[in-house]
């Protein structure tokens, strides 16, 4: 049995404390494979030991891989956040949500630890005694801005070796000759004055001193002109023009006192992408993108909370390593309860207040105070789980109040929408980044052909998956198509499985058999000449077999929330079920003509992939055999160990996990699963929406939406008064009384 391995280490429910804490799963070799946190350890951990079919597929894989479980009790949820992140960083568990940066971003670096600070552009953030400003979206824009600013603030940009060589020879570098360096190496400028130039350059680059400094230069220019110092006025004019160009590259989108991080979010069943805009002093000072694979069946609120913990833990650790939260753990035997203590960043908060006071007093940007890693405000498209705890934790990191909220209107809402759009585009790029490469795609198809013993590469691959609720309700299937290893969404199909009695197939194997039978009886299986399959051939081929009906429902082009094309194999939304008697005046129901136009199934695939192991493969092979299809290869990809199964073979084929062929099969399988579960949830949602409101006369769909949006549920409506109903737009007194009476009669 697949679930037996969990019984080897399943703790007694009474032994698990009903307290907040963090837990670790380990595999047979003692490696940590997953770290999680919970408000109530007992409730959370017992969920992992429920029947496997109730768990998310990847959670199934995780618990079947695990061989031990341990947990740590903490005092508060805030401590669990810190400890969970510490363990994730320490152990790098394979099943944990890890937000990956899709590229390295450029930063403006200032070597604050040197007596003569240096300014340069870098993509690494590992040097000690160095402050980093950014990230910036485009390196060429950063270099261009720095080049312009060096004419106004001629600071050192050379490496340590070049600087020491100039000191020994007494000859500065070329930048000093063209006015882009003040040559501190040969004492043309004092160290304190050079440091002040660095502070001013950083202040302009970060948006703190851009406009104020330009205003000061403008006043100086006018004074010089009034005193007839025209050469000085001309130099100041040129500096102002250069600074204006740099400042305009970072448009002011808010008031200058606005410091905020604005996040956008996009996700599907398998992956999520996040995009962030960094707003400092009213200007967009940078942007960044992360992507993550969904490991557990967690919602967007939990994903957003995990993102904020990871992003700001990294930022705070990079900028304040000396005052990062200290965690001491007393680790005992596996399965025992443990305690932790955490210290907050009081010293860092005091230092932040002192820097802010000093900057307000002097009017200068403090070189030792880079862009705050934690802003005053965080704008998110989805309110994160444990928002209040996160705000408290971020307040400690920042040394000042931090607010997390969802923008609903105004400029911040518009910027959040832009971030959402960027996240959506990044999600699509991430999904196709490897498979879209021609070389990788060719290698992937060749790997699959070699592993399965095919004569040629499978140019067209179809994959099938079954999705249903416990008990077989809302049973559906999906068919996804990959041509040249690229998803062809216009060929996607989805099937509503009905069965002989209209109640669905008896199990997943029967559902898979029905789906494939239906697909290939609608496809070009009677020969390329396009002849029909009559009723006698159909009955003969299906005699004694599982011949329940499958209605193949397709997606109209531009008519679904996934943006996927598709068409209807029958032209009416459903195929004609086998065995349904039509009117005698209509065409015989059991005759299926070969169709070649785009509204029907296309040509046969080279390879059929099913989501599952040997039983699923045998069911698929049987369906193809009964349909007279003998030139299409079949294989299955089992989730647990990613084994490839083929018909009539007692042992699986093992493909290297890092091979392009394995990646292609996984991509096809996961896409089919996503497509199936999306349709299943859509069907389930439609069924759940049929509520008590359907029985009330005069309350149509539009009124139902208004009522549900206002009250949230039918249960809340039953607790409402007539006056409460009248507050809903369009509901008068008479209709409110009818609603009240109808809901209380039921």
Curated annotation (Swiss-Prot):
Cellular compartments annotated: Cytoplasm
Keywords, comma-separated and alphabetical: Cytoplasm, DNA damage, DNA excision, DNA repair, Excision nuclease, SOS response
Stored SMART domains: GIYc (SM00465), HhH1 (SM00278)
Domain GIY-YIG: residue ranges: 18-97
Pfam families per record: GIY-YIG, HHH_5, UVR, UvrC_RNaseH, UvrC_RNaseH_dom
Keyword Kinase (UniProt): no
Signal peptide range: none
KW Electron transport (keyword) present: no
One GO term (biological process): nucleotide-excision repair
Primary localisation category: cytoplasm
Cellular component, GO annotation: cytoplasm; excinuclease repair complex
InterPro entries according to UniProt: GIY-YIG_endonuc, GIY-YIG_endonuc_sf, GIY-YIG_UvrC_Cho, Hlx-hairpin-Hlx_DNA-bd_motif, RuvA_2-like, UVR_dom, UVR_dom_sf, UvrABC_protein_C
Domain of life: Bacteria
Gene Ontology MF terms: DNA binding; excinuclease ABC activity
Stated family: Belongs to the UvrC family.
Stored NCBIfam families: PRK00558.1-5
Function: The UvrABC repair system catalyzes the recognition and processing of DNA lesions. UvrC both incises the 5' and 3' sides of the lesion. The N-terminal half is responsible for the 3' incision and the C-terminal half is responsible for the 5' incision.
PANTHER family referenced in this protein's UniProt entry, alphabetically: UVRABC SYSTEM PROTEIN C, UVRC/OXIDOREDUCTASE
Record's subunit section: Interacts with UvrB in an incision complex.
Name recorded for this polypeptide: UvrABC system protein C
